[in-house]
Amino acid sequence: VQQPMIVKYVESLHNGIQSQALSRYAIGYILRGTKYIYDGDKRQTLSRGDVFYLGIGHHYIENFPEGGQPFEQVLFYYTPGDLQRILMHLNITYGLNISNEHSCENCRNRSHVTMPAWNSLRNFFINTNNYLRDEDFRHDETAENIKMTELIYLIASHEDCCIKSKLLSNVDAAK
């Protein structure tokens, strides 16, 4: 059975720090609440409107509901093969040439990166959240692939940044 590419998580209770083991890469967006990602003795705080990348492996996270409302996030999962297929499709079909000159200590040394989402990315995730309310969408592989392609396009065509750098570094893992 194919694992879903797009998942919405809703947590109404604070469950403390959790260990999350990922077998695929993930790009997520905070819809409501606060998320903490732990890196050794450091803690990164994410809030509504932040986009984040999680690499394959273990992550220590904590999700906080806010103001009596549940914590909500949308996550897109992908493999290096998925990413390579989508980038090739964007290049062949639309002539999208992708380059990335960005490199900083943050994205070189961490298995996660976070940043505020830019407008088109924020709108994309809000729209995806609306799609996920529709039961039919949840089991539609074609719709998931189209949304995933749109997400990859929005990141790959954006100016150089940590999220783009991490995403494009995952193509190398497919070779």
PLM features: residue spans?
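A general marker of short, structured functional hotspots
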Residues: 5, 49, 114, 120-121, ...
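Short, flexible segments with low predicted structural confidence
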Residues: 17, 55, 122-123, 149-151
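A short small-residue
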Residues: 60, 129-131
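Exposed alpha-helical structural elements
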Residues: 82, 120-123, 127, 162-163
